[in-house]
């Protein structure tokens, strides 16, 4: 017994001891508020496993403190009040993630039948010996040019079906075939062949009589309309190569973003084939008197269904009505009889990889004649010709295209994307070019800046002033003072803000990977230069883009397409994955989906897919991508010479697993965003906002150069803006697909992790600032563009803003405002 003669034993369980905190002093209201906040914090910590684990088991016996114990020891065991939470809290990547619905172990998730041999390409040229261009009814001059100069030995299935019909008849036609099957040549070859026939003698030779020869002043004979500027440029390139066998036939383009004065000058000189976007063509028909369509025999609507979706229906109606108002002339100004070589009526051709019955009916109401319309459809290896009914199903992708989908939680999206790119470019020559489709322009800008190396490259052209040329006259000596010369204009680099070297995804095999970005808010010269750089790049390259690049673009050697954000409609998905596996080449397409309701989206895609979509979990991609070291760039520009000690520990992979590497990479990305904001505030206190006009700084702590879209700001501000735009874009799926992309099931905090943010920013429904393109040298001119100058699109500013605006108007009740940054083209 003790000295007082009483001993009481209390049994205390092994559970954690709840700290009892009592506040003294101050006002009663303040003490009560603190007491309630601490109580809420303790309750939340008990429900959180990660925090509950930090509270150890109760000790076997309470430690006794003597009366003379040091104050430091007494304070150590005294319960302390819980302080304010840290401003930046980083959650773990592999905890609290939703469970996928797909069972990856079931054999039903795999393709039903594994073919013993690879699938034969469905959009490749025909191998039949009889299938030659000469057998299609084309002239010998064109057939020889295709085989000798363009190296095209045989036509594709759609060309084999469409060219004879358009050469011999004057009927309207629908051309429906898989992506990459040669639909452009399917309508260009008949046009050039029939125009060329005006210059031919009866024996097929070219007439030498100048009075019977077609030239640029013979009149406009064909008009080709396309929804985007990039597609118009591509069609013009194909037509230019084709017309090398007939250089007297002249073509040109009129598109938004270019100088209307220059376009009018080209039209005034004379053209035979015009390639245009609907808005700009309507503008010229209203204001350019020299543009005469009375001789036009063809109206081609390339991706016509897309033009209607983008809101060009009113423009198309006015174009068709103006062409019908002009009486069709049979003799051109030179007195050449156009018939019967050319059609006796205006022929309208609609071509696309996706056509449904509703769109055909809507377009046919005002542009086609029902009794003179032919549907020419090629489905895979089987060619079918149907007259009255159009299939309502979305057209299938090429059979040689390998499709798969990744089930990735929201928190792991960013690191999984980097791991997929790193593993895809791990071997030299494995993937030369890849395209990443993202939903909105702000997200494209952010991911480009994040994956772009922060280390500035030395300028190649940093040479001293150009030396003076040697004197040409014999009497001159080096001591003779040089003659005054006019200062040369500096060469504008349009790709300075859209092309750069990639980081995180390089390997020993591919030490240099070029990164590109493309969206509709960029100026037209920048868009053209960026696409040209990506197409002609000989190094491994990646293009981060919106849906502006999903239709019609034919970029060589694209082996991988990544849909980082799912398409807004199934038809858009078909066109996205159609950027690879073109003209018989193999290709691979990967779709990112989140666990839960989004997994049901696969069933919708599988209905009309020619091949099965293979499911894949994110862990296999992370293991393949993070099996080796990750080259982390410096967080700030002040640390370019070497990494921090903490990052050096992260790079030591001898004891690291793929999970720890993924978490280290995510932590590095978050620190990089925070460092960009901190360095910006330290360099200039006035440049705090994303849209600050003065004093804005980059993630490297240096003054931020104005990008092609006129925006400046830190990487952290860019990530927040990209997050807001992504959430708004998530709500714009078509009605039939919203059951799979449910806003109520989207975890905003986890999604913020995919943008390198540690918490979800607010202001999602408060509207966005409209992008403005300021006149600069990088934008291709000094004149300020107005709505009337562009003439392309609903607001005559961007040809791709119309569709996003239309869809966002439907969602204004949910998100609160329209969004102009969703430029998908």
Curated annotation (Swiss-Prot):
Residue stretches of biased makeup (Polar residues): 83-102
Source organism phylogeny: Eukaryota, Fungi, Dikarya, Ascomycota, Pezizomycotina
Biological source species: Pyricularia oryzae (strain 70-15 / ATCC MYA-4617 / FGSC 8958)
SUPFAM superfamilies according to UniProt: P-loop containing nucleoside triphosphate hydrolases
Protein name: ATP-dependent RNA helicase DBP7
Statement: the UniProt record of this protein carries the keyword Mitochondrion: no
Domain named Helicase ATP-binding: residues: 164-373
Highest taxon listed in the record's lineage: Eukaryota
Motif range (Q motif): 131-160
A single cellular component GO annotation: nucleolus
């Amino acid at each position: 017994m003790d000295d007082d003669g009483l001993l009481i034993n209390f049994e205390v369980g092994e559970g954690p001891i709840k700290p009892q905190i009592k506040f003294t002093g101050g006002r009663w209201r303040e003490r009560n508020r603190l007491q309630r906040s601490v109580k809420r914090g303790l309750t939340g910590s008990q429900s959180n496993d990660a925090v509950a684990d930090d509270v150890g088991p109760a000790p076997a016996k309470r430690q006794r403190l003597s009366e003379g114990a040091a104050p430091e020891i007494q304070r150590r065991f005294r319960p302390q009040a819980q302080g304010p939470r840290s401003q930046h809290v980083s959650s773990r990547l592999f905890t609290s993630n939703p469970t996928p619905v797909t069972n990856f172990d079931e054999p039903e998730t795999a393709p039903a039948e594994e073919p013993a041999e690879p699938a034969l390409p469905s959009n490749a040229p025909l191998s039949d010996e009889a299938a030659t261009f000469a057998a299609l009814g084309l002239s010998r001059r064109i057939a020889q040019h295709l085989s000798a100069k363009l190296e095209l030995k045989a036509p594709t299935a759609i060309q084999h079906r469409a060219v004879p019909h358009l050469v011999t008849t004057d009927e309207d036609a629908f051309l429906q075939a898989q992506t990459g099957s040669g639909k452009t040549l399917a309508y260009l070859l008949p046009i050039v062949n029939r125009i060329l026939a005006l210059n031919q003698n009866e024996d097929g030779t070219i007439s030498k009589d100048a009075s019977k020869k077609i030239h640029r002043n013979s009149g406009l004979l064909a008009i080709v309309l396309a929804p985007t500027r990039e597609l118009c440029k591509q069609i013009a390139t194909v037509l230019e190569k084709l017309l090398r066998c007939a250089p007297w036939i002249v073509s040109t383009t009129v598109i938004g973003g270019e100088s209307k004065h220059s376009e009018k000058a080209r039209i005034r000189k004379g053209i035979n084939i015009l390639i245009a976007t609907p808005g700009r063509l309507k503008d010229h028909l209203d204001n350019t008197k020299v543009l005469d369509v009375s001789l036009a025999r063809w109206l081609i609507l390339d991706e016509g269904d897309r033009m209607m979706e983008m809101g060009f229906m009113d423009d198309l109606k006015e174009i068709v009505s103006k062409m019908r108002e002009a009486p069709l002339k049979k003799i051109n100004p030179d007195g050449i009889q156009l018939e019967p070589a050319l059609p006796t009526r205006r022929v309208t051709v609609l071509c696309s990889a996706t056509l449904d019955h509703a769109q055909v009916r809507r377009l046919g109401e005002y542009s086609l004649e029902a009794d003179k319309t032919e549907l020419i459809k090629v489905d895979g290896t089987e060619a079918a010709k149907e007259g009255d009914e159009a299939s309502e199903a979305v057209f299938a992708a090429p059979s040689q295209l390998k499709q798969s989908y990744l089930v990735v939680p929201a928190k792991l999206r960013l690191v999984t994307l980097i791991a997929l790119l790193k593993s895809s470019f791990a071997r030299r020559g494995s993937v030369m070019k890849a395209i990443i489709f993202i939903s909105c322009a702000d997200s494209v800008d952010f991911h480009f800046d994040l994956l772009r190396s922060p280390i500035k490259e030395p300028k190649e052209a940093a040479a001293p002033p150009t030396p003076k040329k040697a004197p040409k006259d014999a009497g001159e000596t080096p001591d003779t003072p040089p003659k005054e010369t006019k200062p040369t204009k500096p060469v504008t680099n349009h790709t300075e803000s859209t092309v750069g070297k990639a980081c995180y995804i390089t390997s020993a095999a591919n030490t240099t990977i070029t990164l590109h970005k493309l969206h509709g808010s960029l100026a037209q010269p920048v868009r053209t230069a960026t696409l040209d750089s990506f197409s002609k790049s000989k190094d491994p390259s990646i293009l981060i883009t919106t849906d502006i690049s999903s239709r019609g673009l034919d970029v060589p050697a694209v082996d991988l397409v990544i849909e980082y954000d799912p398409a807004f409609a199934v038809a858009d998905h078909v066109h996205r994955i159609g950027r690879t596996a073109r003209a018989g080449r193999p290709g691979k397409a990967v779709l990112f989906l989140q666990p839960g309701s989004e997994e049901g989206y696969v069933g919708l895609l599988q209905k009309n897919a020619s091949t099965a979509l293979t499911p894949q979990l994110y862990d296999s991609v992370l293991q393949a991508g993070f099996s080796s070291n990750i080259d982390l760039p410096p967080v700030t520009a002040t640390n370019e010479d070497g990494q921090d000690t903490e990052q050096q520990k992260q790079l030591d992979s001898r004891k690291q697993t793929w999970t720890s590497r993924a978490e280290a990479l995510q932590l590095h990305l978050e620190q990089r965003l925070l460092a960009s904001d901190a360095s910006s505030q330290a360099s200039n206190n006035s440049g705090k906002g994303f849209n600050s006009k003065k004093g804005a700084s980059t993630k490297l702590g240096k003054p931020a150069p104005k990008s092609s879209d006129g925006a400046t700001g830190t990487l952290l501000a860019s990530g927040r803006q990209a997050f807001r735009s992504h959430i708004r874009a998530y709500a714009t799926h078509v009605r039939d697909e919203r059951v799979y992309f449910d806003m109520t099931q989207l975890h905003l905090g986890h999604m913020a992790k995919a943008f390198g943010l540690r918490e979800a920013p607010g202001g999602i429904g408060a509207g966005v600032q409209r992008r403005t393109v300021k006149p600069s040298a990088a934008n291709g001119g000094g004149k300020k563009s107005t709505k009337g100058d562009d003439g392309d699109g609903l607001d005559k500013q961007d040809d791709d803003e119309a569709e996003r605006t239309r869809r966002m108007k439907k969602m204004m009740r949910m998100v609160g405002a329209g969004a102009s940054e969703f430029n998908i083209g």
